[in-house]
Amino acid sequence: MREAVRAGIDVQCLPGATAFVPALVSSGIPCDRFAFEGFLPPKKGRQTKLESLRDEQRTMIFYESPYRLLKTLQQFAEYYGGDRQVSVCREISKVHEESVRGTLDEVITHFTATEPRGEIVIILEGCKK
């Protein structure tokens, strides 16, 4: 899967019971160890949660609304560095399914120019130690 993504091949996975499984598999980010984090707290506790994940080595999975996506990606870049790999998947198994992959900085640039829509899953590479 990782090599297909690197080669620029459009990869789509069939969905199961949850949206994060096909998002994880199609991300091209290591999926042998991962942590499902769900939605980040919208306000209270958000910075504490982001800080607590700074040294997480497993791939992390988040759900996010399109209205908070850009802010969340910017916070990830601030806390974890803009060179961390990320995959943002939206509308999994629907007509407008899309995966945007790259560094946090690259994906932030994409979503600054393109308004995000739909149900979103973020796959974030873990910390490399």
Which residues does each predicted region cover?
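Class I SAM-dependent methyltransferase SAM-binding "motif I" and its flanking Rossmann-like core
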Residues: M1-E56
